[in-house]
């Protein structure tokens, strides 16, 4: 986004939403997936525009972070929590949901959807030319495993990690309701590919379960961040 659209300011790597600063009328673009959980509480900011990239949760939970290839990054618990926060915003005037699969298969069509939704964004380069112009921080290079052309090579990679899917469903229950709701499957028939597959018990960076005390602590911390953001933006 910061490469292909004109911005007044951006950050070298992911930054928490409440720490972002900008001058009046500045276009500032940030990216931090976990900030999805805060968006329902700040979407009333008339100058906040949200793009939610939805991806097949099976592919999400088999991703590994560039820093630690031995461990899976996310899990179904976290995906469900974040998606539940995004779901109520579908249809909001300043919210746009984009499928990751559409983005990597047709980046320029996806870019056109973004400019149609938010026409004040000024395009500098095509998404398909991103890799020719991108200048990213070292942290981002590590996380993304360097700058590469946008391509669909990561779509459907869950099929190479069936043991991971088996283990996640054993812990969190069937993903079929999630997949049907998001339009990735029409029934539970896909689960037949898991028959006889041994569970992959490799760990996740994020915990599979959160205890009550942690949930309370996280909510208190969230309210603090939301209050800071609203105070900065002078929201009631």
Set out the residue ranges of the language-model regions.
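PAPS-dependent sulfotransferase catalytic core
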Residues: 1-26, 210-211, 225, 232, ...
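A broad structural signal for alpha-helix termini and local helix breaks/kinks
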Residues: 5-6, 118-119, 182
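Compositionally biased, intrinsically disordered low-complexity regions enriched in proline and serine
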Residues: 6, 11-12, 74, 80, ...
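Histidine (H) residue identity feature
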Residues: 10-13, 18, 24, 49, ...
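Short, charged N-terminal helix-start/capping segments
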Residues: 16-43, 209-221
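PAPS-dependent sulfotransferase catalytic domain
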Residues: 26-127, 136-149
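PAPS-dependent sulfotransferases, especially Golgi type II membrane carbohydrate sulfotransferases
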Residues: 122-236
